[in-house]
């Protein structure tokens, strides 16, 4: 489908995932104006456009959260900017309502996530929840993530988020999340889907598995997770809950990784894809995936939802520590044996020297 030039210019200014949200807001503006042709938005003169934008803003202030309004207006402003229309942005922004303290910053607890997992039988939903809770990925990763971006590393999985983008970073899935993801892929194969490197890691619903797979959209991800929240304790303040539908899964991972006393903050920030909180690391903290994975493994017990998986990881950790201690003791024993042998050889040498000296006397 060929886009009208005015919409194509708008499209060129943003990435695919942003375009979906921006066009949705632009279409709402079109509907408010009673228009169906995007070119009609450009027929008015600059003064009329300014007045229309101000009227739309006043309308939004009556029905929308103060914190949400800038994200509604931004797509409309971009449309006019890309089509070379002049309006007084400073004046318009002066009319924006004062931002309020936002709710929705709480993390899900393990109990919350356990309730979410128990409330669904869908393997895709279970895999999604555990993927987001263990990788700390933003929901925007899902519409771009391919199977080629996910590879095995020990009993976990390594994930390349935003592949080939300036925001690219490496994160990981716990053994628990990895198993759920494998179960989901197995289900797709049983439905006759041929999995390839370019296949979506998470695909849209389908009737037949062999139909061309399409990537899940962010809206679909939110809808799938929303269904699992019925019994999760949340408090509503204004139009928002204290725990956000998807982002609180990322918050869970953030808390789990950084609450450890031995946490390496720089590496944890890299794993979460927001190293800007450690500014110099953006240029000098280029950690290899192997190094990041060693840091991630320390947090696996805290990131595991089912106690069974947490126990497995703890047993594995204890066995590794026990083996390490055993190896250390073995090395020390061998060292003592070598030292003892060396001492015996020295004594023998001294005895030989004393014997020769005695014979001379």
Set out the residue ranges of the language-model regions.
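Catalytic-site neighborhood detector that most strongly recognizes the C-terminal catalytic loop/helix
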Residues: 107, 165, 272-324
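Short, basic (Lys/Arg/His-rich) helix/loop patches that form interaction surfaces
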Residues: 222-270, 274-277
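Non-catalytic DNA-binding core/recognition domains of DNA-processing enzymes
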Residues: 12-86, 173
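Conserved tyrosine-mediated DNA breakage-rejoining catalytic core shared by Y-recombinases
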Residues: 144-183, 187
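Basic, Lys/Arg- and aromatic-enriched nucleic-acid-binding interface segment
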Residues: 110-139, 250
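Active-site/catalytic core of tyrosine-dependent DNA strand-transfer enzymes
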Residues: 174-240
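Short, charged phosphate-coordinating catalytic segments
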Residues: 132-155, 265-270
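Flexible interdomain linker/hinge and immediately adjacent N-terminus
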Residues: 46, 51-55, 85-115, 162, ...
């Amino acid at each position: 489908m060929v886009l009208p030039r005015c919409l194509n210019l708008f499209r060129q200014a943003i990435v695919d995932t942003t375009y979906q949200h921006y066009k949705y807001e632009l279409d709402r503006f079109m509907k408010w104006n009673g228009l169906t042709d995007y070119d009609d938005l450009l027929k008015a003169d600059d003064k009329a456009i300014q007045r229309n934008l101000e009227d739309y803003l006043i309308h939004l202030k009556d029905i929308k959260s103060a914190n949400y309004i800038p994200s509604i207006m931004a797509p409309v402003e971009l449309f006019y900017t890309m089509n070379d229309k002049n309006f007084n942005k400073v004046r318009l922004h002066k009319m924006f309502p004062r931002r309020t303290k936002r709710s929705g910053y709480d993390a899900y607890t393990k109990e919350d996530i356990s309730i979410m997992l128990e409330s669904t039988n869908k393997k895709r939903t279970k895999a999604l929840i555990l993927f987001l809770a263990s990788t700390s990925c933003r929901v925007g990763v899902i519409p771009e993530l391919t199977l080629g971006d996910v590879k095995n590393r020990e009993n976990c999985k390594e994930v390349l988020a935003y592949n080939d983008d300036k925001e690219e970073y490496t994160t990981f899935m716990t053994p628990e999340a990895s198993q759920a993801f494998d179960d989901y892929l197995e289900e797709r194969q049983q439905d006759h889907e041929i999995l390839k490197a370019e296949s979506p890691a998470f695909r849209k619903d389908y009737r037949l598995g062999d139909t061309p797979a399409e990537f899940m959209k962010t809206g679909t991800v939110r809808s799938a997770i929303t269904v699992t929240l019925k019994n999760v304790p949340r408090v509503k303040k204004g139009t928002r809950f204290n725990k956000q539908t998807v982002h609180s899964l990322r918050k869970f991972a953030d808390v789990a990784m950084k609450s450890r006393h031995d946490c390496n903050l720089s590496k944890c920030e890299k794993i979460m894809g927001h190293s800007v909180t450690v500014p110099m690391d953006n240029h000098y903290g280029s950690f290899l995936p192997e190094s990041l994975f060693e840091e991630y493994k320390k947090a696996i017990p805290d990131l595991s939802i089912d106690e069974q998986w947490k126990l497995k990881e703890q047993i594995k950790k204890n066995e590794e520590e026990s083996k390490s201690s055993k190896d250390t003791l073995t090395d020390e024993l061998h060292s003592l044996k070598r030292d003892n042998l060396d001492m015996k050889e020295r004594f023998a040498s001294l005895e030989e020297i004393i014997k020769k000296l005695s014979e001379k006397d």
